[in-house]
């Protein structure tokens, strides 16, 4: 059952609202050296085109920190500086970026955290308290180990530090590399704080592994009403992080946008190369943002049965096929004419739906 979203304190990263009633935002992280402004800008452009709302960049040295001023000028997305170990880089970054991410397990003493808070206060930019199971502060790691309890205690401790400094412009993340700890940690912390949550499974693996872990962990939390912004961490292409994240949002009922693809797993009745055709159709129609159920089937049995509730369906037969709109056959065509006709019909349906929404 889809639960109502937990209403959290709203913060802003650039012009993007996080928490409250704001849409759940997606983000990724560049892998270039941040000081290489041209390469980093190119990656941010790719993420923008893929549909990302925010971008995070690594600040590994002073050169990276100083480059943020120029990068901010050319970035099409709000910029988050990711800081580990060296709090002074955060002080430099705060002068240019839209938000700072710190890992309390390695940023240093209370005095160093205060310095970062003061810099963020001055520029009115938020902080993400980024707790990772693998790098908890010594006192929590020794007492609890890399457990949900240890992660939650770290988050509460650091939230209190910021609150005591009269700073509440922050969000929290609790990341582990597996599904169970991730879910348990967020569930445990949610009733204890009002701050927005950034969701993610850290070091989740390649496209296949990460997609499964993230769908289970983040999708489950989203359906429980937990989560305000998210990243799907994938060892691979940047665009895949956004593609998978937006798919998780759609299928967890938190994003009413884009096509819900329905296709059969194939069987002995199949009379066409359905795998290639399904890939071809999805790629050709990937630009459509209108919510539609689109079905690609390998035979008329499934098309007239399982796919009859789709907004539009295509079914392949013996060198011919059907195009079905809202349960009614509208075309019976030779196989060579099916694809282009189907694409046109889906695009026209999307335009009809968009027009009706505006009217």
Swiss-Prot record:
Pfam families: GcpE (PF04551). The gene is ispG. GO terms for biological process: isopentenyl diphosphate biosynthetic process, methylerythritol 4-phosphate pathway; terpenoid biosynthetic process. [4Fe-4S] cluster binds at residues 264, 267, 299, 306. Pathway: Isoprenoid biosynthesis; isopentenyl diphosphate biosynthesis via DXP pathway; isopentenyl diphosphate from 1-deoxy-D-xylulose 5-phosphate: step 5/6. Binds 1 [4Fe-4S] cluster. It catalyses: (2E)-4-hydroxy-3-methylbut-2-enyl diphosphate + oxidized [flavodoxin] + H2O + 2 H(+) = 2-C-methyl-D-erythritol 2,4-cyclic diphosphate + reduced [flavodoxin]. Keywords: 4Fe-4S, Iron, Iron-sulfur, Isoprene biosynthesis, Metal-binding, Oxidoreductase. HAMAP family: IspG. Its EC number is 1.17.7.3. Converts 2C-methyl-D-erythritol 2,4-cyclodiphosphate (ME-2,4cPP) into 1-hydroxy-2-methyl-2-(E)-butenyl 4-diphosphate. It comes from the Bacteria. SUPFAM superfamilies: Enolase C-terminal domain-like, Nitrite and sulphite reductase 4Fe-4S domain-like. Its cofactor is [4Fe-4S] cluster. GO terms for molecular function: 4 iron, 4 sulfur cluster binding; 4-hydroxy-3-methylbut-2-en-1-yl diphosphate synthase activity (ferredoxin); 4-hydroxy-3-methylbut-2-enyl-diphosphate synthase activity (flavodoxin); iron ion binding. Belongs to the IspG family. InterPro entries: Dihydropteroate_synth-like_sf, Enolase-like_C_sf, IspG_bac, IspG_bac-typ, NO2/SO3_Rdtase_4Fe4S_sf. This is 4-hydroxy-3-methylbut-2-en-1-yl diphosphate synthase (flavodoxin).
